[in-house]
Amino acid sequence: MKLHELKIKRKYYDDVLRGKKTFELRKNDRDYREGDLITFKVIDEEPPKEFNDCFIRAFKEPYIVFRIMYVLKDVPEYGLDKDYCILGIRQLKE
């Protein structure tokens, strides 16, 4: 089991926290597997003017962990590129 720390835009993170968004479309470059864990770092969509690169804001939010429940990959006949996967995720309860 691995722990993956992923970047996520604020608008998607809010939906994940509310349980409205229970999946993630990701580039399949980390060998995701069922049972792996995910945490998220929220990124700003618009970096501050003084920065050229993507800016990661440190939010004082609870450290929340999600478990990968399902990995959908290798189905180009349904329009999912071979380099991407869809992760079914569920928040771990404390």
Predicted regions and their residues:
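Catalytic phosphate/metal-binding cores of nucleic-acid and nucleotide-processing enzymes, i.e., regions
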Residues: 1-94
